A protein has these predicted regions:
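A short, flexible loop at the N-terminus of ABC-type nucleotide-binding domains that lies
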Residues: 1-7, 11-23, 71-73, 91
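The feature captures the beta-strand-to-loop junction immediately N-terminal to the Walker
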Residues: 37-39
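Helix-to-loop junction immediately C-terminal to a conserved catalytic motif
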Residues: 52
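Conserved ABC transporter NBD signature motif
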Residues: 60-68, 77
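Conserved ABC ATPase signature
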Residues: 139-143
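Catalytic Walker B motif of ABC-type/P-loop ATPase nucleotide-binding domains
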Residues: 164-168
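ABC ATPase nucleotide-binding domains
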Residues: 239-254
């Protein structure tokens, strides 16, 4: 499997703070689900900001499809990579269809927006893939939390990017909707061959739905391997700095 993202010797720090990353090296495989794990402050959110060009004052290199990330315009990057953030500002009095339509903006003339036949086809495809086609005319404020998360994922599909980043996609959802969202993510990865990068706190979800795990501790990668290899109490205790118990291939307490 070829690499779609390569990070080489990357270093970064926020103003006067100590370095978040020092000579970080990481590769993300094309067409796989890679999950970033670690306790708060380990660098997960910063890594997402780096990949999305929200942070650019780093040293080292980030390559996306063998091209230096800094050389991408934001509009060009938006055709390659889409993100569902943990805390999104959601317009309330707008239909699901119209909200998903916003995802087509990277393909439009900045001075003149006109929805094309291709735009409508991409939007409807995204709604069907996320089981929202029957809700296309529903006002967003009427949706449940799980349905709203599907809308954000539909926006990524309509944006037509090969890479999707999901920052805590199951946060604030009940167990039923958590499972539903994770199954959707896995299906989209398998059927559409998308490269998906997730940030998760739930270790069992990470093991169940990921191909690869990248575990961070104080800005360093201490594990970058197949998901099942995370079932190691000593390793998990180190990652989270707390006692974690595993039973029958599941984390039962932490």
């Amino acid at each position: 499997m070829e690499n779609i993202i390569e990070i080489k010797n990357l270093s970064f720090k926020y103003n006067t703070t100590k370095a978040i990353f020092s000579d970080l090296n990481l590769t993300i495989k094309k067409g796989e689900i890679t999950t970033l794990l670690g306790k708060n402050g380990c660098g997960k959110s910063t890594l997402i900001k780096l990949l999305s060009k929200n942070i650019t004052n780093y040293t080292g290199n980030i390559f996306l499809e063998n091209k230096e990330l800094k050389s991408y315009s934001l509009k060009e990057l938006a055709t390659k990579l889409s993100i569902v953030y943990q805390n999104n500002i959601t317009p309330q009095e707008i239909t699901v269809f119209d909200m998903v339509s916003f995802a087509r903006l990277p393909y439009q003339n900045i001075f003149f927006y006109k929805q094309t036949k291709e735009d409508i086809e991409k939007i409807n495809f995204a709604l069907k893939e996320t089981d929202l086609i029957d809700y296309k005319n529903t006002i967003v404020s009427e949706l449940s939390g799980g349905q709203l998360q599907r809308v954000y994922i539909a926006m990524c599909l309509a944006q037509d990017t090969e890479i999707i980043i999901l920052d805590e996609p199951t946060t604030f959802l009940d167990i039923k909707y958590q499972k539903s969202i994770m199954k959707l993510v896995k299906r989209l990865n398998q059927e559409l061959h998308l490269t998906i990068i997730m940030v998760l706190h739930d270790i069992n979800q990470a093991i169940t739905y990921s191909d690869n795990i990248v575990a961070l501790l104080d800005g360093e990668i201490i594990k970058n391997d197949k998901a099942h290899t995370l079932l190691d109490e000593e390793l998990l205790n180190k990652i989270y700095d707390t006692e974690i118990k595993i039973e029958n291939n599941k984390v039962i307490s932490w």
